[in-house]
Curated annotation (Swiss-Prot):
<feature type="binding site">
    <location>
        <position position="136"/>
    </location>
    <ligand>
        <name>Ca(2+) 2</name>
    </ligand>
</feature>
<feature type="binding site">
    <location>
        <position position="56"/>
    </location>
    <ligand>
        <name>Ca(2+) 1</name>
    </ligand>
</feature>
<keyword id="KW-0677">Repeat</keyword>
<dbReference type="InterPro" id="IPR050230">
    <property type="entry name" value="CALM/Myosin/TropC-like"/>
</dbReference>
<dbReference type="InterPro" id="IPR002048">
    <property type="entry name" value="EF_hand_dom"/>
</dbReference>
<feature type="binding site">
    <location>
        <position position="67"/>
    </location>
    <ligand>
        <name>Ca(2+) 1</name>
    </ligand>
</feature>
<keyword id="KW-0479">Metal-binding</keyword>
<feature type="binding site">
    <location>
        <position position="138"/>
    </location>
    <ligand>
        <name>Ca(2+) 2</name>
    </ligand>
</feature>
<feature type="modified residue" description="N-acetylmethionine">
    <location>
        <position position="1"/>
    </location>
</feature>
<keyword id="KW-0106">Calcium</keyword>
<dbReference type="InterPro" id="IPR011992">
    <property type="entry name" value="EF-hand-dom_pair"/>
</dbReference>
<feature type="binding site">
    <location>
        <position position="62"/>
    </location>
    <ligand>
        <name>Ca(2+) 1</name>
    </ligand>
</feature>
<feature type="binding site">
    <location>
        <position position="58"/>
    </location>
    <ligand>
        <name>Ca(2+) 1</name>
    </ligand>
</feature>
<feature type="binding site">
    <location>
        <position position="134"/>
    </location>
    <ligand>
        <name>Ca(2+) 2</name>
    </ligand>
</feature>
<feature type="binding site">
    <location>
        <position position="143"/>
    </location>
    <ligand>
        <name>Ca(2+) 2</name>
    </ligand>
</feature>
<dbReference type="InterPro" id="IPR018247">
    <property type="entry name" value="EF_Hand_1_Ca_BS"/>
</dbReference>
<keyword id="KW-0514">Muscle protein</keyword>
Amino acid sequence: MDTLDEDQVQALQKAFNSFDTDDKGFITPDTVGVILRMMGVKISDRHLQEVISETDEDGSGEIEFEEFAALAAKFLSEEDEEALKKELKEAFRIYDRGGNGYITVHTLKEILRELDNKLTEDNLDSIIEEVDEDGSGTIDFNEFMKMMNG
């Protein structure tokens, strides 16, 4: 984690915690792919599996935060931050079908399901509860960015 600054570590911790809804201290390899893709990292499933195999030091098939952060560090750099923000803004705009500055909780659930079909309804509800801070039933760009960047 030497190559990550404090803000990046916090953002990764928040993303990790959002998907570790049962507080087990680990996430699945599939979830790693979901988080990286949501953060704008373009990676093939095959390359992702190779990187996860290298990173899952204890061979448990479960990715602890330290392992996840080490893996993510390979893909994140400060120069990428602006590009990441731009990509996230574009992704948000695509899903903001009405162009009104927000997406519905239902749309966010669809996005998350599309990214990881193993998420249960309880997992999704936990993520939504954390993201929709004002309980409005909609996710504005700032809430979306907080979810993605911490």
